């Protein structure tokens, strides 16, 4: 809930007045235009949202830089369950100046893609064991929301 509050506030959709949250004029306007509401939130999440906001990893750029490349990777390779380390390796090839070992997998998949429904993470009882929580696959929503040429 805290992340949602931050996203809505940073998008200018809510404000705090006398300790209470309320909709801004922009927020009220977007309540009737769901497409524009979704566009506003998605643009914020992919351009401005700092996925390192609530963690202790030192490199702030990991997972934030090249976010659309990470989305393309999931789109391209995500039909089947894959270890998140695979995506971190591919990301490291594209951005060798970053230390993607720390934070990338958690920030990208847990803090962004799963947050907006673009991936599933294997946290069900069927996946208990060594790779529990470390394998992901894309959802149908990813292909419905984004196209790549």
Regions found by a protein language model. Give the residues of each.
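Accessory beta->alpha helical hairpin/"wing" motif in late/C-terminal subdomains of nucleic-acid enzymes
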Residues: 15-52, 120-149
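Short amphipathic alpha-helical interaction segments
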Residues: 1-10, 17, 98-117
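Short N-terminal helix-initiation segments at or just after the protein's N-terminus
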Residues: 10-14, 57-60
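Leucine-rich, amphipathic alpha-helical/linker segments
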Residues: 34-88
């Amino acid at each position: 809930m805290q992340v949602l509050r931050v996203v809505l506030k940073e998008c200018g959709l809510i404000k705090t007045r006398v300790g209470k949250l309320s909709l801004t004029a922009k927020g009220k306007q977007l309540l009737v235009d769901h497409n524009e509401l979704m566009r506003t939130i998605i643009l914020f999440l992919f351009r401005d949202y700092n996925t390192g906001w609530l963690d202790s990893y030192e490199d702030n750029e990991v997972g934030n830089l090249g976010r659309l490349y990470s989305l393309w990777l999931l789109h391209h390779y995500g039909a089947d369950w894959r270890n998140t380390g695979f995506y971190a390796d591919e990301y490291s090839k594209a951005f060798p100046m970053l230390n993607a070992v720390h934070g990338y997998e958690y920030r990208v998949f847990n803090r962004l893609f799963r947050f907006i429904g673009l991936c599933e993470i294997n946290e069900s009882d069927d996946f208990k064991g060594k790779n529990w929580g470390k394998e992901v696959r894309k959802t149908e929503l990813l292909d419905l929301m984004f196209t790549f040429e």
